[in-house]
């Protein structure tokens, strides 16, 4: 009798799971139908709208949560991302603009959001095309061009490449590219390194023209490019270690330490407690800008309370907190949003998803990986992510555009073809790494540091997640009645239950 009851219980749970999975698949199908209905599909690249659902079901991690703004935006952003996957005679690319723009290189390629494309795309199951995309920038983008294309914009390619390989290990690929990453770093030094050791950049080539502290002709030392170059040096050192090249490991480890100290000594404003731009002539620019949060994206600042106080500016409505998201400059700045027409490309205050996603990543790193992290909390992070998700709208329909009015949510380029489906930021990666808290490693360890609380969500699931060649499924279910996997946090690896715990807290699983 006990055996029969056990079998019946197992059948009940199995049928409940199948039913829940079918409901999720139906929900995704409904989302895609709605997205397709709203789109005139002016440009078709590798994956058409009619194939979008099948591609998504085969390739993306499936996600479910009680917050419908976040859930819908998660699928909308994957639906939008696949629009930009494009074949070329020199490999598969990921475009930034869906329609051709004048400042692009061949095949409508632009390097500005390259790092974002790799961080987002690394979670796609069939993602080998991203290696072609990386190789395009390393070996093909500048050929037969009248001006440099790869270095047309600041980049954190080595860091993003390592991030990609933390999800999809390939040490041979890393070894084959290491010397070229070294050469490219040295090229950046020749082009942008100042006598004091910091890097300078025009704001337009940081992807943030008409900024408060920058310009198109001034050689200012910005927190953005210096953080990128620090992150790149750290990544190259780690790649060198992975492929047993101690000489390059020592070189870049030392370089990263030196650059880090230069940033701390030269770009940190002790009085305003913020990382700022150092002017070509003179000291620090007085204004706080969102690029001052980027150092935490790369874990550059030490774990000290003084540095953490910079994050007090994020929830402050006189700082960066606006009704529709994170502003690019502090709102108390007297010249906030006074440059240009207010409808061109101006990063003197308006919301720019490129930096919104960077800021969220920096904040999540601060909360997850720093001990002295009391300036903000997980509720502040959730508010920013929810706001970011909710901002994806125009006329009541899902939309992602170029940049946005911080008070009204108006997309300032309107429904302009160049703005539509603008692929300039991450979103799925924010949900997977920052909110749910999957922290990819170079070794076969699945580490999770959740930053969403049971007060916000009493359930969520993230399934068919490919990580280190394993199929991961994660379920959070307070009552156990949603997924019938048991109460609490349950994790499956290749279909086998590998961990279950009552609370939504940090955990690790060895995948060997």
Segments and roles (model prediction):
Residues 101-131, 291-303, 356-369, 375-381, ...:
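Alpha-helical support elements that line or immediately flank enzyme active sites
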């Amino acid at each position: 009798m006990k055996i029969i009851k056990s079998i019946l219980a197992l059948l009940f749970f199995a049928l409940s799971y199948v039913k829940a999975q079918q409901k999720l698949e139906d929900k995704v199908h409904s989302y895609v139908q709605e997205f397709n209905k709203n789109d005139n599909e002016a440009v078709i690249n590798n994956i058409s709208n009619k194939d979008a659902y099948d591609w998504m079901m085969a390739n993306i991690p499936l996600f479910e949560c009680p917050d419908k703004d976040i859930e819908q935006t998660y699928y909308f952003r994957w639906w939008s991302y696949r629009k930009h996957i494009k074949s070329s005679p020199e490999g598969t690319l990921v475009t930034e603009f869906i329609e051709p723009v004048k400042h692009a290189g061949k095949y409508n390629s632009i390097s500005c959001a390259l790092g974002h494309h790799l961080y987002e795309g690394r979670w796609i199951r069939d993602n080998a095309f991203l290696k072609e995309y990386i190789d395009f920038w390393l070996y093909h983008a500048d050929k037969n061009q009248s001006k440099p294309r790869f270095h047309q914009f600041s980049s954190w390619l080595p860091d993003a490449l390592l991030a990609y390989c933390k999800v999809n290990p390939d040490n041979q690929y890393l070894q084959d590219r290491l010397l070229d990453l070294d050469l490219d770093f040295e090229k950046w030094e020749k082009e942008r390194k100042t006598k004091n050791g910091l890097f300078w950049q025009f704001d337009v080539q940081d992807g943030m023209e008409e900024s408060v502290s920058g310009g198109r002709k001034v050689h200012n030392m910005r927190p953005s490019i210096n953080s990128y170059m620090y992150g790149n040096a750290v990544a190259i050192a780690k790649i060198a270690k992975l492929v047993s090249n101690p000489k390059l490991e020592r070189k870049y480890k030392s370089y990263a330490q030196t650059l880090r100290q230069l940033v701390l000594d030269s770009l940190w404003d002790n009085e305003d407690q913020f990382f700022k731009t150092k002017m070509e002539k003179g000291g620090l620019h007085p204004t706080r800008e969102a690029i001052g949060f980027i150092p935490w994206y790369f874990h550059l600042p030490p774990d000290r309370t003084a540095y953490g106080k910079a994050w007090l500016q994020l929830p402050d409505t006189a700082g960066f907190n606006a009704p529709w998201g994170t502003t690019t400059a502090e709102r108390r700045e007297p010249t906030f949003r006074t440059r240009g027409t207010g409808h061109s490309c101006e990063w003197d205050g308006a919301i720019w998803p490129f930096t919104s996603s960077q800021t969220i990543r920096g904040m999540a790193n601060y909360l997850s990986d720093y001990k002295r992290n009391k300036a903000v909390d997980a509720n502040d992070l959730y508010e920013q992510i929810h706001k970011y998700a909710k901002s994806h709208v125009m006329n009541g329909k899902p939309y992602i555009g170029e940049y946005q009015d911080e008070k009204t949510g108006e997309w300032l380029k309107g429904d302009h073809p160049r703005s539509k489906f603008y692929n300039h930021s991450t979103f799925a990666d924010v949900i997977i790494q920052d909110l749910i808290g999957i922290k990819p490693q170079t070794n076969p360890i699945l580490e999770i540091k959740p930053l969403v609380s049971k007060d916000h969500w009493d359930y969520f699931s993230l399934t068919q997640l490919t990580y280190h060649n394993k199929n991961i499924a994660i379920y959070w279910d307070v009552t156990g009645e949603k997924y019938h996997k048991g109460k609490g946090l349950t994790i499956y690896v290749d279909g086998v239950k590998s961990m279950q715990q009552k609370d939504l807290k940090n955990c690790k699983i060895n995948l060997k």
